[in-house]
A protein has these predicted regions:
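Glycine-rich segments within core transmembrane alpha-helices of 12-TM secondary carriers
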Residues: 1-11, 202-210
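C-terminal membrane-cytosol helix-exit motif in multi-pass small-molecule transporters
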Residues: 10, 35-54, 237-245
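Helix-to-loop junctions at the C-terminal end of transmembrane segments
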Residues: 14, 121-134, 218
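Short amphipathic helix-loop junctions that connect adjacent transmembrane helices
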Residues: 90-107
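Loop-to-transmembrane helix entry/capping segments in MFS-fold secondary transporters
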Residues: 104-105, 189-199
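Structural signature of the two symmetry-related core transmembrane helices
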Residues: 136-151, 231
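Helix-loop junctions at membrane interfaces in 12-TM secondary transporters
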Residues: 153-165
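Intracellular juxtamembrane helix-capping segments at the cytosolic ends
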Residues: 174-187
Length: 260
């Protein structure tokens, strides 16, 4: 939700420029505000006290019996992250500007609504997972989202493109809570900390590589290529994930999500 508000605030320089305030000064102030927000987050985290381990809880342990499963998941999640990095929000904003001439203020408003849809979709994810399962939630909400991204790349005008992108936002993040729960469900309790880090680090590294490729495709004039490539790679990831793990049993305690 706050990411959505931050996107909306991206239009402030244009709004302040209309009031006679220098646009460049406003942009510089926003960078300072971004740094101040980061410092505030650090202060808040540093004030959190470490909680003692609960009695009877499994002590964290390195990956053991679940190592092979976690390695396969990490490889698949890395493909997903690499695909997502091809069209990060900054590149998507650039695409909207280059393709349709969308202003900074309008782009901020779009990302605000897209962020709200993404946030609410994550709240709906547990309900969907209770009905169809964690793996099916990850796969069968992600594939339509990727198709909407491809359709946006081929859209004939701005309104169709924004409509497809908003539809994508309503589905694309629904797999996030389901993915975390699924990883925890296929490993032993003692391995959960190691599994979380082992799947997160490769995802971050993969996501760091692809924005430069997406930017290079934009610079070469292939404006739709990063969106289409992202959508196709994500669909390939979803199909590979479903094929590899649809028969894999999961911890029933994890999959029985709280119905309250």
């Amino acid at each position: 939700l706050f990411a959505a508000l931050g996107a909306l605030a991206a239009g402030l320089p244009d709004a302040l420029a209309a009031l006679g305030i220098d646009r460049l000064a406003s942009l510089r102030a926003m960078f300072v505000g971004y740094a101040a927000a980061g410092a505030s987050i650090w202060i808040l985290y540093s004030g959190i006290e470490r909680q003692p381990a609960q009695e009877g809880a499994a002590a964290p342990a390195p990956l053991g019996p679940s190592r092979a499963i976690v390695i396969r998941l990490a490889a698949l999640f890395s493909l997903d992250s690499f695909a997502g990095g091809l069209i990060v929000n900054s590149l998507l904003a650039l695409w909207l500007f280059e393709r349709f001439g969308l202003s900074l203020t309008a782009a901020g408003a779009f990302f605000f609504w897209a962020g709200l849809l993404s946030a609410f979709s994550q709240l709906l994810a547990p309900r969907v997972a209770r009905r169809i399962g964690l793996l099916n939630t990850m796969v069968f909400t992600h594939i339509p989202a990727s198709l909407f991204l491809i359709l946006a790349a081929l859209a004939p005008d701005l309104w169709w493109a924004l409509g497809f992108l908003l539809a994508r936002s309503a589905l694309s993040q629904m797999d996030v809570p389901a993915r975390s729960a699924y990883v925890m469900s296929v490993v032993t309790p003692a391995e959960r900390t190691a599994a979380a880090s082992f799947t997160a680090v490769p995802r971050s590294l993969a996501a760091a590589l692809s924005p430069s490729l997406g930017g290079a495709l934009f610079a070469a004039g292939w404006l739709a290529a990063p969106l289409v490539a992202c959508g196709c790679l994500k669909i390939a990831y979803d199909l590979a994930l479903w094929q590899a793990f649809r028969q894999h049993p999961v911890d029933e305690v994890i999959t029985k999500l709280d119905s309250r």
